[in-house]
Amino acid sequence: GYDPYSSSKGCADLLATSYRNSYFNINEYKKTHNTLLATCRAGNVIGGGDWAKDRLITDIMISVSQGKKVSIRNPKATRPWQHVLEPLSGYLQIGQKLLEEKVEFAEAWNFGPSDEGSITVEEVVQNVKKHWDKIDYEINQDPNQLHEANLLKLDCTKANTILKWKDVWDS
């Protein structure tokens, strides 16, 4: 990836794959080790309990509760938004397969929304505003702001075809 965020995701997967191949190779399962290692990646997860800094829904809630405008960094950026329960269902499927000792599932997996579920930051704000009219926002025009990719999406073809997993809720 061009920016540190997307590069960090790729690096994490590469590191996990390297670790799996070196120490928990599936060809050596039950011979030299008893560990199956899979990695799972989700889209931009929203849902209860996420109060981390620079999270869109969190920023909206905090700004409204303080009577402030929400500052939007990149309104035209498209993200793979999904409720926390969506990827969790995929994670549980992978966990079940690993518990069943199905070594072919010890790989990297993506769990994200369909292409139709990827909408812009501004569309998310507008959707929330439809249900909570107290929301007012402004576009952050900071010229020193760090680079962010305009489009993030996940290829979930493997999860869709092999696990028959798909997202249920729309954005």
Language-model segment annotations:
Residues 2-38, 64-66:
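Active-site Tyr-X1-5-Lys
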Residues 31-34, 50, 54, 102-105, ...:
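Non-catalytic, surface-exposed connector residues within folded enzymatic/regulatory domains
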Residues 47:
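Conserved protein kinase catalytic core
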